[in-house]
Structures are given as structure tokens and as C-alpha cells.
UniProtKB/Swiss-Prot annotation:
It catalyses: L-proline + NADP(+) = (S)-1-pyrroline-5-carboxylate + NADPH + 2 H(+); L-proline + NAD(+) = (S)-1-pyrroline-5-carboxylate + NADH + 2 H(+). HAMAP family: P5C_reductase. It comes from Aquifex aeolicus (strain VF5). This is Pyrroline-5-carboxylate reductase. SUPFAM superfamilies: 6-phosphogluconate dehydrogenase C-terminal domain-like, NAD(P)-binding Rossmann-fold domains. Keywords: Amino-acid biosynthesis, Cytoplasm, NADP, Oxidoreductase, Proline biosynthesis. GO terms for molecular function: pyrroline-5-carboxylate reductase activity. The lineage of its organism: Bacteria, Pseudomonadati, Aquificota, Aquificia, Aquificales. Catalyzes the reduction of 1-pyrroline-5-carboxylate (PCA) to L-proline.
Length: 265
């Protein structure tokens, strides 16, 4: 398995933020010499060169020199790119939001090896959270190879495709909501007299430590809330206010609306 991974050559179509993030992760696993990228914005060539990654002038050349092709373009550009991959015989990974396997098969054909992945921005630091499904045309060896490749970028959840829009809202957009919460904590710290920089560090360390504690204890969050909350104490006063303002309901509706938007893409 590891020998197969080390000899893979991965092509990435679309060298935006996510394409760059995956290029960095994959290069750590495979070596930069086994990564090739392309983008319709030719200025991205300079960026690829700075990163030490080969830049292909077009999709066909990239596909001809890749065992796996990752499609990392905007949904509006999906048809144009997929048309250029109709003759490709390797594995196609798509991280395009809202572009189902069925839509891809209509362009590529039902015989193609298609894997749909929904990542989040945390891939950039190797801590991404990704959903994965495929159209059933991959062998077990190919499926394992793809999963091992992606695990170099974070954690992987194999789910039904019908849940992808919900996953997009929860994990794909989730980091932005977490960043907003951290910013709110930091601003609250400023209101209490800290500098923003110090308050941000305190908020960030608090969130990271809390997440680590919850993950290691593997309990319901409410159990840890109870450990922090003393009867008649300071924490319960804050919890009470959050509940009065509908904090949990607001977060739930935030995810619901984001999921509904994903369905419309």
C-alpha cells in the first residue's frame, strides 16, 4: 500500500485556496515531484513555481501525466473541466460543492472512477475534516489508496451522498462559524479590558483546549458543561443568558440555512 502511494502522481485542476491546500498536503505524502497543477488563470504558474510544483498548460496534459486527478474548480466551471476529462481512465476526485456524482457521470460517463470529497479549509494545516463517497467503480485497492492519500490532509468520514449538503454546512462552512465564535470571545475580552491580541490568544487556547478535552473524554458535551458549572455560580449565569437568547437554536438554524443554500448550488 505505501509503495503504491509513493509512486502515485496526482494532478490538481484549479489552484485556488483549496487546490493549494491539497497540493501542500499531497506533496508531504508523495513529494512535490509527484504533484502537477493547472489553472485557467495563468498567473497561478508563478505561485506553483514558488511552491516547487509543476504547472501544466492545460487539463489534457495534466490528465495524461496523472494517476489521480483532483478537480478543485468552482461549480460554475465544472462542465468545462469535466468535458476535458471524458477520455481520462484514472481516478477522478471532485471537491466541487453541489456537483453530484450523477451530474458528473452525465458528462464523464457511468464507467468512470469518480470519488466525491467534501473538505474544509483546515486541510491547509493537515487537520481537514472531509466526507467521501464514490460511484462504486473503484476496486478495493483503489479505494484504500485514495483514502490513504486523503488521510494525509486530515480526518475522513465515508457517508451517503444525500448527506453531503448537510456535511458542507456542518464541516465545510463550520470553520467560519467557529472563527466567528472565537472572534466574539476575543471582542468580549476587549470589552473586559484586554487588548484584542491577548484576548484572541486566550480565546483560541480556550477553544482548542476545550475541543481536545471533549475529544479525549469522548462524552456528551453536556457532561463537561456540568463539570464547569457550579450551582449559583458565574458560569451558569452566562449559560442562562445564552439559552435566553436562543444560542443553540441560532446555531442549528445557521447550519440549516447553510445546508439549504448548498442544495441550491
Amino acid at each position: 500500500m505505501h509503495a503504491i502511494i509513493l509512486t502515485m502522481r496526482v494532478g490538481i485542476v484549479g489552484f485556488g485556496n483549496m487546490g493549494q491546500a491539497f497540493a501542500l498536503c499531497f506533496s508531504k505524502k508523495l513529494g512535490k515531484e509527484n504533484i502537477i497543477v493547472t489553472d485557467k488563470v495563468q498567473e497561478k504558474r508563478n505561485l506553483a513555481t514558488e511552491m516547487g510544483i509543476a504547472f501544466a498548460s492545460d487539463v489534457k496534459f495534466l490528465a495524461d501525466n496523472s494517476d489521480v486527478v483532483l478537480v478543485a474548480v468552482k461549480p460554475k466551471d465544472s462542465q468545462e473541466v469535466l468535458q476535458k476529462l471524458k477520455d481520462y481512465k484514472g481516478i477522478i476526485l471532485s471537491i466541487m460543492a453541489g456537483v453530484s456524482i450523477e451530474k458528473m457521470e452525465k458528462i464523464l460517463g457511468k464507467d468512470k472512477k469518480i470519488v466525491r470529497v467534501m473538505p474544509n479549509v483546515n486541510v491547509a494545516v493537515g487537520s481537514g475534516v472531509m466526507a467521501i463517497t464514490d460511484n462504486g467503480n473503484l476496486s478495493e485497492e483503489e479505494r484504500s489508496k485514495v483514502e490513504e492519500l486523503l488521510l494525509s490532509c486530515g480526518t475522513l468520514y465515508r457517508i451517503e451522498e444525500r448527506l453531503f449538503d448537510a456535511f458542507t454546512a456542518l464541516a465545510g462552512s463550520g470553520p467560519a462559524f467557529v472563527f466567528s465564535f472565537i472572534d466574539a470571545l476575543a471582542l468580549a475580552g476587549v470589552h473586559q479590558g484586554f487588548s484584542y491580541e491577548q484576548a484572541l490568544r486566550i480565546a483560541l487556547d480556550t477553544v482548542m483546549g476545550s475541543a481536545k478535552l471533549l475529544k479525549e473524554f469522548q462524552v456528551n458535551p453536556n457532561e463537561l458543561i456540568a463539570k464547569v458549572t457550579s450551582p449559583g455560580g458565574t458560569t451558569i449565569e452566562g449559560i442562562k443568558y445564552l439559552e435566553e437568547k436562543g444560542f443553540k437554536g441560532t446555531v442549528m438554524e445557521c447550519i440549516n440555512r447553510t445546508s439549504q443554500k448548498a442544495k441550491k448550488l
